[in-house]
A protein has these predicted regions:
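A well-structured
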Residues: 1-322
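Active-site-adjacent "gating/activation" loops or surface patches in catalytic cores
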Residues: 184-201, 238, 308-375
């Protein structure tokens, strides 16, 4: 994406562990298999969890692993080219099929799981499979007050591809396609933001801030506002229907943390963040020789900042040495990830912004981990 070669251009992942390509017929075969699996799951276990919970958990795990294989593969593929029409079409087709069939056949499972009485569940824990999944079961039962009727849960799952998730994907595509013109060259948002944080020229930073502001105005800002409205609105309505007391409650419960702990963190950040920020910017202005920072100076590099371009291979060596110093096991996992080509590193136009690691368990209980970067 930038003109600086770092060696990251050659670091691309190999997704052959899952499929050979977007046209691999095994993708459709796996989707068809999932459809049959969820239908059989409902027939075998609906209304029978008091006697079949162990087998149900095993079957549900198989469904989740195969679903993960399909969906994670497509997500990884889309990350390197967000607007690729063929990938978008495939994702849409898969989502519509799976959400329809999952919505029709799976909602009963969690609803009936949380409805099991304590005495019945205590007996079921004699099954090694059920006992192994006890933390997962208890966590699911923690949400018992918030489940809706089965027909409602079914409808929500079926319409999921056409709601907030779709708007989020739409925004990612808009952001990846956004072009900002700077001194005659068209650049991506990620590139100009990077330049803004690295430029030591105050006039250049001011110019970059202006072109970024212009680029974010107009149609992009309207679509961004509409996306936020749809996502927040969808979440707000569902939270009320599920009787959550406030927007953070579902996340806090999912993280198994009390509201009071999160509130304490928020309060400390609110009370101390402002003064610390002002202190930091006063110190930064002094280092830059300025009485007052302009908006475009907020992320300016310090005069003593090292602007050396670090080749990807050297950066990876540093990471490995750091992990090796406290956990040879973790260092070994990273080294294995490099050897098996599980990293996609270059910063290029059209890629998803940011970085992430996606770890999953594939069918056959095969662990896999993929790392996405914009180096």
């Amino acid at each position: 994406m930038t003109n600086t070669n770092t060696g990251a251009e050659k670091v691309r992942w190999d997704l052959g562990l899952m499929y050979s390509g977007l046209d691999d017929p095994q993708i459709d075969a796996d989707v068809a298999a999932l459809v049959e699996m969820v239908k059989k799951f409902k027939t075998s276990h609906k209304g029978k969890l008091s006697t079949t919970l162990g087998k149900a958990i095993s079957g549900y795990s198989e469904i989740e692993m195969l679903e993960g294989k399909v969906k994670v593969y497509l997500y990884l593929l889309q990350s390197i080219n967000v607007a690729e029409p063929a990938v978008k079409t495939k994702i849409a087709d898969v989502d519509k099929t799976l959400c329809r069939e999952f919505g029709e056949n799976l909602p009963f499972f969690r609803i009936e799981l949380v409805a099991l009485d304590d005495a019945t569940l205590a007996k079921l824990y004699a099954d090694p499979i059920v006992a192994k999944h006890r933390p997962w079961i208890e966590h699911a039962r923690f949400f018992k007050p918030h489940f809706l009727a089965e027909p409602v849960e079914s409808a929500l799952t079926k319409r999921a591809p056409f709601g907030a998730i779709s708007w989020g994907d739409f925004f990612d595509e808009l952001e990846a396609d956004l072009e900002i013109e700077f001194r005659g060259d068209k650049k991506t948002l990620t590139e100009v933001l990077y330049m803004l944080t690295k430029s030591k020229d105050a006039d250049e930073r001011a110019e970059l801030s202006r072109v970024i502001a212009r680029g974010l105005k107009g149609p992009f800002s309207k679509y961004a506002a509409q996306t936020l409205y749809m996502v927040v609105g969808d979440n707000s309505v569902e939270n009320r229907e599920r009787t959550f007391k406030h927007p953070m409650e579902p996340r806090n419960k999912s993280n198994r943390i009390q509201d009071e702990v999160v509130d304490a963190l928020h309060n400390v950040v609110r009370d101390m963040g402002g003064p610390l920020m002002r202190r930091f910017y006063r110190l930064k202005a002094a280092h830059l020789g300025l009485k007052k920072l302009k908006w475009s100076d907020r992320n300016a590099p310090m005069p003593f900042a090292d602007t050396t371009v670090v080749p990807f291979e050297k950066a990876m060596t540093t990471v490995l040495e750091a992990y090796e110093s406290f956990s040879p096991t973790l260092a070994g996992l990273i080294r294995k990830s490099i050897e098996e080509k599980r990293i996609d590193a270059p910063a290029e136009k059209g890629r998803r912004a940011g970085a992430y690691n996606y770890s999953i368990v594939l069918p056959g209980n095969i662990p896999a981990s993929f790392t996405f970067l914009n180096y």
